[in-house]
A protein has these predicted regions:
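Active-site anion-handling motifs in enzyme catalytic cores
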Residues: 1-380
Length: 380
């Protein structure tokens, strides 16, 4: 490749093993390669996230081409970083940590001056006292050398307001070029209150619909099975209660995790307790393939919901966290539960009766992708 080739970059790519994050990266790569066909695309992994090498190799085998770069610098050996990892949540000063990092490390980011545009990976970003500091500090460092920083649709937890004042967040998110696209109504409402100009879009994974339709259903599976894909390392009893209720309703249940590094130990324990099969797909494509052969997907993972939607199968969301709660509201889902322990035979019968309505609501939600941003350039 010639040294003077035009380049764009993706930063904060999450390669830790969540197939939803790999789907985000694939959607971004396909969108950007279509918009910038003559450009080299460099991908920088998230500075403080691990890399699932096996699933990353599978992603490289199946996905579009790109140049993988080394992680950008970040200092995780500071007193702040240690304090931020403690459950006691000592009083923290994240802004001071951000600018301390910028002062010490900004020269290392001069290489970003070579890019025509830089794109922040979509998804749930700026989370907590550690990751938010890492991301904001990185953006400030890059901004010194290149102000053309855009972001694919992302969401932010309301808890960020416990770390930063509103005017501070306005300044920090002001590092992003407009349009700032958020992927749900909850984040949009929070940004409106803070005076941060944004537009509501959809997770960029919705842009993979045509590709998803070409994926063959998984062989050797029974169509009447219910796929239970509920995450929660700290609520084992509730997870088991949900599985038991589905089994007691006379249905066949199989477990599936979209993020094996996080859920693997729990899903194996549940599998052993109930003597049921479990699956840990290596790719988002394999996940869609599994979802195409079932009667219902029960999940609290946002990308479980989105990939289930791409598979055009029925969904029962478990809205025990903000992301599925936002999905339920935005997609106007007729049935959901607040916790897996609230699943019961009566609810499942209602879901059966409303399968057509559920699938139609999901189709309507997907169709919004043609009218809303799934990237920072969709409507330009």
């Amino acid at each position: 490749m010639a040294s003077d080739a035009k380049k764009i970059a993706i930063i904060f790519a999450n390669l830790k093993g969540n197939v939803g994050d790999f789907a985000i990266l694939e959607a971004m790569l396909r969108d950007l390669s279509g918009r910038f066909p003559s450009h080299v695309i460099d991908v920088y992994p998230h500075p403080v996230a691990s890399v699932d090498k096996i699933r990353f190799e599978e992603f490289q085998r199946l996905g579009p081409s790109f140049d993988l770069k080394r992680k950008t610098a970040f200092d995780t050996k500071t007193a702040y970083w240690q304090k931020a990892g403690r459950k006691s949540r000592e009083k923290l000063n994240p802004s001071r940590e951000i600018f301390s990092f910028v002062e010490r490390f900004s020269p290392y980011f001069s290489k970003f001056s070579q890019y025509e545009k830089i794109f922040v990976a979509g998804g749930e970003q700026f989370v907590g006292p550690r990751l938010s500091v890492c991301m904001f500090a990185t953006l400030f460092c890059i901004h010194e050398f290149n102000k053309n920083i855009y972001a694919y649709p992302f969401s932010v937890r309301p808890g960020i307001l416990n770390l930063y004042q509103g005017d501070v967040l306005s300044e920090y998110f002001g590092l992003l070029r407009k349009p700032i696209v958020v992927r749900d109504g909850i984040t949009k409402g929070m940004f409106d209150k803070l005076g941060i100009e944004s537009v509501v879009g959809l997770d960029c994974v919705h842009g993979l619909m045509n590709l998803a339709r070409s994926i063959a259903p998984q062989q050797g599976r029974r169509q009447n099975r219910v796929i239970y894909s509920v995450s929660g390392q700290n609520n084992f009893a509730e997870l088991c209660a949900g599985v038991e209720q589905v089994i007691n309703s006379g249905r066949e249940v199989e477990l599936l995790t979209t993020c094996y590094p996080e859920d693997g130990s729990v899903i194996r324990k549940i599998s052993e307790r109930f003597a049921i099969n479990w699956h840990a797909p290596m790719s988002w494509q394999e996940t869609v393939s599994e979802f195409k052969v079932c009667s219902l997907v029960i999940t609290n993972r946002l990308h479980g919901l989105i990939l289930g939607s791409l598979a055009e199968t029925a969904l029962l969301p478990v809205a025990d966290r903000k992301k599925p709660e936002a999905f339920v509201a935005d997609a106007e889902m007729p049935h959901y539960v607040k916790s897996p322990e609230f699943i019961n035979s009566e609810l499942l019968q209602k879901v059966d009766a409303d399968i057509i309505l559920i699938i139609q609501r999901m189709a309507d939600y997907r169709n919004k992708a043609a009218l809303l941003h799934t990237g920072p350039f969709t409507l330009e």
